[in-house]
Each structure stands twice: as structure tokens, then as C-alpha cells.
Amino acid sequence: DNCIPITDEEYFEDDIVGLFCAWLKKVYGEDTLEENLDFIANALGNKGKTSREVIRNYFLKDFIKDHIKTYQKRPIYWLFDSGKQNGFKALIYMHRWNADTIGNVRVEYLHRIQRVYEKEIIRMQEIIDNSHYNKEISSATKRKEKLQKQIKETKDYDAKIAHLALSRIDIDLDDGVKVNYEKVQTADGKKMQILAKI
């Protein structure tokens, strides 16, 4: 359906890291998966305790910058980006864009991650209320605060993206990346920043 979610934690099997691992398994075999992930993580050199975390952080923070630079500010992968809290990010391939893309991203992916955050906030509160360990309570409190910021960011983003989804904006590939990139973020003459800046 032309949408790959990028999450800061492993919430879905079909997020970008899950799909990347599935691709590595298919191409190089399951026996060498961890070795290949370690090799890639070492090459990326990002932050993270495990190779999957390093790869996740790369996709979350650096992939789109590298992609925009490689394609000289005319990216073929567009990043839906809710903001600094990394509440919602998803890649789409511009050549598969259609009038329902924004609506699909909103309903199938944005609302899905919002439900995950709501459940995680409840789970963190249960840990805070029931744990006897200060370290666990402190960790759950910190995570809950982060999740609350992310849910707020995604709800603010949802308000922007909803209007654009109702507009059912299609693109014309002949107009080029820059024109279409602006077009899909504009409704009724007003630009709403829903994609990463290029």
C-alpha cells in the first residue's frame, strides 16, 4: 500500500526495520541475518545498543537527509513527519502516489500508532502504580512522559493531515518533485507542513 512506518521502538513487524530484516533474510538467508545486521550497523556507526537499534536510529534520523542529498533535493521517497518527538514517520514512494495516499497514511498508520501510544501510556501507568522498584518507576515515568509528548504531536499532526486527506490530492509526475511536494501539502491555498523539509 506504498507506506512504510518508521518508529522509535519496535511496535510493528511491518515497520521499516522489520521489512529490512525480512529482505535481508530473503536475499542472504536467515543463518547470516545477525552477521549482516552487525555489518550494516557498524558501517552506519549510529547510536544504539544492538544492531537493530542502530539501523532503526539511522532510518529515524538520518536516512531522509542522505536520500535528499543523494537526489539533490528532489527525493523519490517522501517522509511523512509529525515533528521533533518522532511521534509519526512513514516513507512513501512518490511514483506510487494516488489521491488516497494521505487518507490511507492517516487511517491505516497514523491512527494505528496513536492507539499503540495510548495503550503504552496505560501500561506505563500500571507499572508506576504497582511497582516496588524505584528504578522501574523512574523508567516508566520517563517513558510515559515521552509517549504523552508523542501522542500530542500525532494528534496535532492528525488535524493538519485530515484536511489534506479530504482534499484527495493527486500528483502529476510530469510536474516534477518540487511542484508535487508542495502540491500535496497545500489545501485551499494554505500550506501545511506534513512532509520532511527538503
Regions found by a protein language model. Name each.
Residues 1-198:
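Terminal accessory regions of large proteins
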